[in-house]
Amino acid sequence: KKSFLYKVEDFFTKKELIEQKKNIDLSRYNIPNGVNIEKPVFLNKNGLAFLPKRILLKIKGKIIVDGGAYFGDSALVFLEYTPSRVYSFEPVNLTYKKLKETIRINKMGDIVTPIKLGLGKKAGKAFIKGTNSAASLTTSDFKNAQEISITSIDDFFSGKNDVIGLIKLDVEGEELGVIKGALETIKRDKPILLISVYHRPEDFFFIKPLIDDLNLGYKFMIRKTSSFRVTSETVLIGYSG
């Protein structure tokens, strides 16, 4: 009698099963206590590990926008690509404190700037629930929610001479709005894009066409950056050139 039950291993490729057994050396980083370590950040560099070297060189000497900075794990990795500065946006009170601690204990203050703002389509206010890597905006359940201020990427960098080399977004379902608020920056600088598209189904279908409509010659790939999860940590990677 045929069984229709699946093993967990059936949902992963052979390569992913091998990666699951790998030990990630974090000894060169100082990690604050009380945070969840997201292995894909260090293993696949938020998706940068899938890009050719000639594309990665475009980050050197330019600005990185880290949307959804969490405790600064992405910033630790991004420094390997020698940006001029990393702006780490993290609006959650407790997480922002961890971000500042990471910057301090790793002596990254000359390169990494913590920004206690959320990112969105336009400036405004919102309420957010949660204190870890899965905090999310709420429009109805305000109990125990934190009010946060929001800016757009276009507004934040308006009037500045900064050239953006990379935009990374993992903002718990607000990615589409953030991209809509960054279109002028994308048109101007054509940065590498690392956009999480697994929080909301519509993001998987709408974000790429929105960027395609700009006619900037972007190439795209979709990669699952985590070898440990079936669907989460799916990232739309875009680059020009």
PLM regions with names:
Residues 1-241:
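Phosphate/nucleotide-binding beta-alpha loop and adjacent structural elements of enzyme active sites
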